[in-house]
């Protein structure tokens, strides 16, 4: 009888990626198969997120439900990972002593050993260390699940924004070696992946060591990934404006595989609030980067993150944010009411904006962005869009579903043989959360770009020219 594993995941795409790696790791090492039913599981893992308010209490409520399962199944192993685990550590077991394993985002690769120790009666295991890149060296080979895949290229953040827990829960910035990233993506391409989404808490801060001892910048990595046969689309998230340098903008001029969509969080349109947030950029600098990006890629759409009701945010500060939203014409946003995160500098500031004021501001902000998103969608009406076909539509399984370059979901009628490839579709209807279209042609009628060899891309780098952060590049001869 096979052993069963249930993983419940909260939070960002990095957590989703980590959970998929946990499943692959425990399958490869111990033969665990995933189940959607916690009652069937031999191991229950909760991968947590600490971004939202009352994250800790949410964890203990979930653990309380699992406690009942363990009462009926004493051999059940319960583990808690993710950012709340990093923050709370032993405190989790103090409040929930039936938890067997507490592990951080950087120690998930040690799960097989920790589970074995628990099952052998060696007691509970707590490991929330930051062993840098060791995690990636211990994971099994990637397995594709469709035409798109996430690939983590770096971990952590060294910016220490006053509201953010990431540096404390995932550590400072650590980049994976360039060769490791390219090898993983090449493996995925061999399995039919056509689109990769490069992940990192501050992904454009990537500075990966190379085989020759030099440093690969994020801009160089984008070109190298684009050169891998079979990879026709590249997305990445999440970016920081201060690291969105000119060499990255240049990539948008000559690398069509990088999609015409960018998520670049600004958080606020007020320089005063940005300073209090310890964001090392101004509104003018942000707008300047977007202006240069649109000169390089005129059809690009932009999304962002916004925090409303940050301590001491005045009506004038909020109006500055609304002005920025209209000037940039954001396509979408992840917008949140500010709530203090324990252990961050902002948690020591008075949370002095009334909750009703916060709610009104958030509703107004989201209303404007939703209207802008609809206008951008309507501008696509009648156009031909290239869709990466992901599978049957959730609205109608007799139809297909895919995404445009600018991340719009499109539903259309077509043969299921199109799944996993590209299709050109004429947009016939615009809805609030999706588009409808008419199939025009399949991939066999397209002239897709032929990839070049990675070494040719490397040879394009100028000798010993520092990039925007002063890191010199090495050109092999």
UniProtKB/Swiss-Prot annotation:
Cofactor binding, note field: Binds 2 [4Fe-4S] clusters. One cluster is coordinated with 3 cysteines and an exchangeable S-adenosyl-L-methionine.
EC number(s) on file: 2.8.4.3
Presence of the UniProt keyword Ribosomal protein in the record: no
Annotated positions binding [4Fe-4S] cluster 1: 12, 49, 83
Entry's Gene Ontology cellular component terms: cytosol
Residue ranges occupied by any TRAM domain in the UniProt entry: 378-441
GO molecular function: 4 iron, 4 sulfur cluster binding; metal ion binding; N6-isopentenyladenosine methylthiotransferase activity
Keyword Iron tagged: yes
Catalytic activity: N(6)-dimethylallyladenosine(37) in tRNA + (sulfur carrier)-SH + AH2 + 2 S-adenosyl-L-methionine = 2-methylsulfanyl-N(6)-dimethylallyladenosine(37) in tRNA + (sulfur carrier)-H + 5'-deoxyadenosine + L-methionine + A + S-adenosyl-L-homocysteine + 2 H(+)
Gene3D superfamilies from the UniProt entry: Methylthiotransferase, N-terminal domain, tm_1862 like domain
Key words of the record: 4Fe-4S, Cytoplasm, Iron, Iron-sulfur, Metal-binding, S-adenosyl-L-methionine, Transferase, tRNA processing
Cofactor(s), by name: [4Fe-4S] cluster
Group of enzyme by EC: transferase
CDD domains according to UniProt: Radical_SAM (cd01335)
Domain (Radical SAM core) ranges: 143-375
Sequence positions that bind [4Fe-4S] cluster 2: 157, 161, 164
InterPro entries linked: Elp3/MiaA/NifB-like_rSAM, Methylthiotransferase, Methylthiotransferase_CS, Methylthiotransferase_N, Methylthiotransferase_N_sf, MiaB_methiolase, rSAM, rSAM_horseshoe
Compartment(s) where it occurs, according to its Swiss-Prot or TrEMBL record: Cytoplasm
Function recorded in the entry: Catalyzes the methylthiolation of N6-(dimethylallyl)adenosine (i(6)A), leading to the formation of 2-methylthio-N6-(dimethylallyl)adenosine (ms(2)i(6)A) at position 37 in tRNAs that read codons beginning with uridine.
Similarity field: Belongs to the methylthiotransferase family. MiaB subfamily.
Subunit description: Monomer.
Name this polypeptide is given: tRNA-2-methylthio-N(6)-dimethylallyladenosine synthase
Organism: Aeromonas salmonicida (strain A449)
Lineage: Bacteria, Pseudomonadati, Pseudomonadota, Gammaproteobacteria, Aeromonadales
Gene for this chain: miaB
